[in-house]
């Protein structure tokens, strides 16, 4: 594992201890799919909204056949997209925004493909990706522990041993992707979730960049 300035990581996490994690707050969900909406011909059933950002809505859902909880992220640019309440179809009302939305949707799909190719216990796992309702979705593990940001807001300053454990796990994830010429570029407490075993898991590769062997950016 590369040398890590643990004091700098801890300072960074503490500096962000008031940041609100988008997951679990259920805000800004006026354009979200309704509870009990189904996707992929009933394969997935929406249970509720976990959060919404500028580029997507995150849902808690059930994978019906396997009887398990999953997280589904839907591409939805809330400033540029509309949803038909009856059909759930997503549209772009302004013709001038169509190309912009298409470009960012392609990036959303690329993000999912990037994560799906990774295999590290401290990086979120993606199980499925599909298009429906005029937009794109990908399906991830559901992690019930909330984010590192949530943890600090709830419990206050972490014990040193706990903080160092999370830092080492995040560093392991970063070392893994750096070895594959990927930079995450958006590591912060709200992008580190805690799984059911108390381990840190890195999410949200929306700003990530991939480089070739010469150091030139490829995505």
Q: What function would you assign to each model-found segment?
A:
Residues 47-53, 58:
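Protein kinase glycine-rich loop
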Residues 166-167:
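Activation segment signature within eukaryotic-like protein kinase domains
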Residues 84-117:
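AlphaC helix of the eukaryotic protein kinase fold
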Residues 62-69, 76-80:
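Conserved N-lobe loop of protein kinases adjacent to the ATP-binding glycine-rich P-loop
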Residues 172-182:
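Protein kinase catalytic-loop region centered on the HRD/HxD motif
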Residues 133-147, 151:
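Conserved short submotifs of the Hanks-type protein kinase catalytic core
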Residues 129:
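Activation-segment/catalytic-loop signature of the eukaryotic protein kinase fold
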């Amino acid at each position: 594992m590369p040398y890590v300035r643990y004091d700098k990581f801890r300072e960074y996490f503490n500096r962000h201890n008031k940041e609100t994690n988008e997951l679990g707050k259920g805000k800004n969900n006026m354009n979200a799919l309704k509870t009990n909406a189904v996707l992929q011909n009933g394969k997935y059933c929406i249970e509720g909204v976990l959060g919404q950002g500028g580029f997507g809505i995150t849902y808690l859902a059930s994978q019906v056949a396997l009887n398990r909880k999953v997280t589904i992220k839907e591409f939805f640019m809330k400033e540029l997209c509309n949803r038909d309440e009856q059909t759930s179809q997503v549209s772009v009302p302004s013709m001038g925004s169509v190309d912009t939305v298409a470009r960012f949707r392609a990036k959303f799909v690329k993000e999912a493909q990037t994560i799906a190719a990774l295999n590290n216990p401290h990086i979120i796992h993606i199980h499925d990706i599909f298009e429906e309702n005029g937009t794109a979705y990908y399906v991830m593990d559901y992690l019930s522990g909330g984010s590192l940001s949530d943890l600090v807001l709830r419990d206050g300053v972490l014990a040193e041993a706990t903080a160092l454990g999370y830092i080492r796990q995040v560093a392991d994830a970063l070392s893994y992707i750096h070895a594959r010429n990927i930079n995450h570029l958006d590591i912060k407490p709200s992008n580190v979730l805690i799984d059911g075993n108390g381990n840190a898991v890195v999410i949200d590769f929306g700003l990530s960049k991939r480089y070739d062997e010469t150091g030139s950016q490829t995505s």
